[in-house]
Amino acid sequence: MQVIETLAEGLKREIKVVIPAKDMQDKMNERLADVKDKVRINGFRPGKVPAAHLKKVYGKSIMADLVNEIVREQPAAILSSRGEKSATQPEIAMTEDKDEADKILAAEQDFEFTLSYEVLPPIELKSVKGIKVTREVIDISDDEVNEQVLKVAESARAYETKTGKAANGDRITMDYVGKVDGEAFEGGTDQGAELVLGSGRFIPGFEDQLVGVKAGAEKTITVTFPADYPAKNLAGKEATFDVTVKEVAAPADVEINDELASKLGIESADRLKEIVRGQIESQYGSLTRQKLKRQILDQLDEMYKFETPNSLVDAEYNGIWSQVNNDLAQSGKTFEDEDTTEEKAREEYKTLAERRVRLGLVLSEIGEKAGVEVSEDEMQRAIYDQLRQYPGQEKQILEFFRSQPGAAASIRAPIFEEKVIDHLLTEIDVTDKKVTKEELLAEEEGEAKAETKKAAPKKKAAAKAEAADAGEGEEAAPKKKAAPKKKAADESAE
């Protein structure tokens, strides 16, 4: 077998592989010898079929199997012998001429094919001792815990039916039919809908017009959908809602005690506070981690400058760009609405894709050298987390992971990345800094606004890219699946 390099430009490689017809003939004869005692051909005793007849009957199919095996197995072996790793699966090209293909299958012509691929760039790791980051630390006050516990209590608040007029804070149960230009519209009808007046859940003006109604009342409400309402067919339009009030209920007093905890399935009020404190710590810890990771990645980005494989960058960019356009379509907005242009947005996302690929390669190299591994238990937990997000679809999702090798890799990659960050945190200079909740959130909001100015869809659309780039864990999934259709007037569902 001859392996001839025909192209070596930057990271691009093209290899011509030639397997002489004689070698192919020898391999075919070996296979024929293996099967001659096993095949049954009319007119011949087992094992006595002449080689020429055996070749005539089985030669082409055996040769086709050989060709498939070579194309399947040799690329990896060739790259390994060259000490190269391809960025993506090599492209394989062979003759499409039928006459030439027949000659190859008849072992009358050399079998040739070409491999086209990009190699992963060599990365010489640098010392990370010079990386300095600040870890923001927050002391969670009892007042903040109590405030959150109160919100939990209010969400579980009981309501008692009243006969008087509805006031802000009361919950009404109602049926309604929404109409635009006298015609009912999709998502504008609901029965038994519950709404706490003053909650701001429904579009502006809707709740205000229900203050003062009583059970049994029928009322037509007129409102105007916001100009930026996600449903294009409703944005900026005047609508009427024919409302029938089924019940008015006043909120019961909220008391944080063991009885409340018991209703929530928790043994005591003290335990409830512990759980809430833990949730707050987790939320702040996640935010602190994101910002810490961003600092590390920014400095690694400054340290490493090398050519990135176009195939990886293009794949990353295409994924980001597809999500950006999906988000714009869902919101009914354009790039101009976000104070940018498509051309500028493309440039920014291309830069983001290049940065993410480069950092991904660096983190991969660091992790490999440090012996970072993802355990089977960690994979199982991550897959279980995925299953919990899609109740009722567990079997399909498990089958997807079993049948798609890349699916498991997509689960493994972020776990590996976080473990590499954990490793780096043991190697770099980390300084703790106490901050207030307001300082932490204000800084985060400022960064979000800065990103939004560049290209507003970025933070949401490129959430997956940002997970490696800026450590943001925001999902790029659709919002609430059914709520927008169920309650078009309900802004919180959008």
From Swiss-Prot:
UniProt KW Cytoplasm keyword: yes
Protein's recorded name: Trigger factor
Isomerase found in the keyword field: yes
Superkingdom as given in the UniProt entry: Bacteria
Keywords: Cell cycle, Cell division, Chaperone, Cytoplasm, Isomerase, Rotamase
InterPro entries (UniProt xref): PPIase_dom_sf, PPIase_FKBP_dom, Trig_fac, Trigger_fac_C, Trigger_fac_C_sf, Trigger_fac_ribosome-bd_bac, Trigger_fac_ribosome-bd_sf, Trigger_fact/SurA_dom_sf
Summary of the function given for this chain in its UniProt record: Involved in protein export. Acts as a chaperone by maintaining the newly synthesized protein in an open conformation. Functions as a peptidyl-prolyl cis-trans isomerase.
